[in-house]
């Protein structure tokens, strides 16, 4: 029972923004964020290095850069958003929450625009292939 409680508390901390970002991705692509984007190329998932491998990976590179630009804000925070038809609307009045939401919104739109260009060979891509020098944000 104690283990279940620890897992529940841990998930509460993880759930906020990652869950909402996943909803945005699903809304724009029809795909599962976890299965399609959590370990893709050199930048989709935790960390990132090297040269983005394709347009989808470049979406993740830009997303990482965006998070870097919202200094002082915690990127895993929960924020207010809504979906209207195909649009994603960030509605939070808190400047940090709004900025993080905008980073996620732009990335989800980018994934949607490139949904047919992603290549399965970049799923679970080894970071050992990500050694080329990265472009600047």
From Swiss-Prot:
This is Acidic phospholipase A2 CC-PLA2-1. Ca(2+) binds at residues 43, 45, 47, 64. Disulfide bonds join 42-130, 44-60, 59-110, 65-137, 66-103, 73-96, 90-101. Snake venom phospholipase A2 (PLA2) that inhibits blood coagulation and platelet aggregation induced by ADP and arachidonic acid. Inhibits tumor cell adhesion and migration in a dose-dependent manner. Abolishes the attachment of human brain microvascular endothelial cells (HBMEC) to fibrinogen (IC(50)=0.12 uM) and dramatically reduces its adhesion to fibronectin (IC(50)=0.12 uM), whereas no effect is observed on type I collagen, vitronectin or laminin 1. Also blocks the cell migration toward fibronectin and fibrinogen. SUPFAM superfamilies: Phospholipase A2, PLA2. PROSITE patterns: PA2_ASP, PA2_HIS. Belongs to the phospholipase A2 family. Group II subfamily. D49 sub-subfamily. It catalyses: a 1,2-diacyl-sn-glycero-3-phosphocholine + H2O = a 1-acyl-sn-glycero-3-phosphocholine + a fatty acid + H(+). One of its GO terms (biological process) is angiogenesis. InterPro entries: PLipase_A2 (IPR001211), PLipase_A2_Asp_AS (IPR033112), PLipase_A2_dom (IPR016090), PLipase_A2_dom_sf (IPR036444), PLipase_A2_His_AS (IPR033113). Expressed by the venom gland. It comes from Cerastes cerastes. Its cofactor is Ca(2+). One of its GO terms (molecular function) is toxin activity. It is found in: Secreted. Binds 1 Ca(2+) ion. Its EC number is 3.1.1.4.
């Amino acid at each position: 029972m104690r283990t279940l409680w620890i897992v529940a508390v841990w998930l509460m901390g993880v759930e906020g923004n990652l869950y909402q970002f996943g909803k945005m991705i699903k809304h724009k692509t029809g795909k599962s964020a976890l299965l399609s984007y959590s370990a893709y190329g050199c930048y989709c998932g935790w960390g990132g290095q090297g040269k983005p491998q394709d347009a989808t990976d470049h979406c993740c590179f830009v997303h990482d850069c965006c998070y870097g630009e919202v200094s002082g804000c915690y990127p895993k925070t929960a924020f207010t958003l809504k979906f209207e038809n195909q649009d994603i609307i960030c509605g939070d009045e808190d400047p940090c929450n709004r900025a993080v939401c905008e980073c996620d919104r732009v990335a989800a739109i980018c994934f949607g625009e490139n949904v047919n260009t992603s290549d399965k060979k970049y799923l679970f891509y080894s970071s050992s292939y990500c050694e080329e020098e990265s472009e600047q944000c």
